[in-house]
Amino acid sequence: QATKNKQTTNPKKETSAYTFQGGAEIPRLKNKQKEQVIKHEGYAVSYNSDYKIANWVAYELTSKEATSKKNEGPYGGEFDEVVEDYTRSGYDRGHMAPAGDMKWSAKAMRESFYLSNICPQKPGLNRGIWKDLEEQARLWAKENGSLLIVTGPVITDDLKRLGKNRVGIPKTFYKVICTITN
């Protein structure tokens, strides 16, 4: 979790990467891209205010968290004015850090519904292969212990926009899943 693995900036690499506990690094974005890094209980997000979507979301998923049965939600949160942009748009609100990975904490679950953790996704992707990949990651966490997951949209200069708030609509997404070993 972002609270257990507090994000720190490595002074020697301050211009090149965000360093998380355990040494995992996420490269900083090019200067032309906007980013505000926000730490939540269950994940950290690099939020792009121009496109109103995440640049990336990173979190740890442990075997204990992957087997949690608690289910709190759904919730609203920051940037809720953007929700109406999704209504009848033909796009799902695709979670980057899925609510299903945050069942271990009511606060983490609530924060997973923040729109800074959401990107427009076509229903076939969100309810299909993306959901399958989220479920597979939970299985891997149960089998292997802890995973570090970094996920997000591929942001290009030609993104189409959604609604009056002009939310960026990514064409493609990525999810990097790494096993954490001591």
Give short role names for the model-derived ranges.
Residues 1-182:
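Domain-level detector for secreted/extracellular nuclease and nuclease-toxin modules, and
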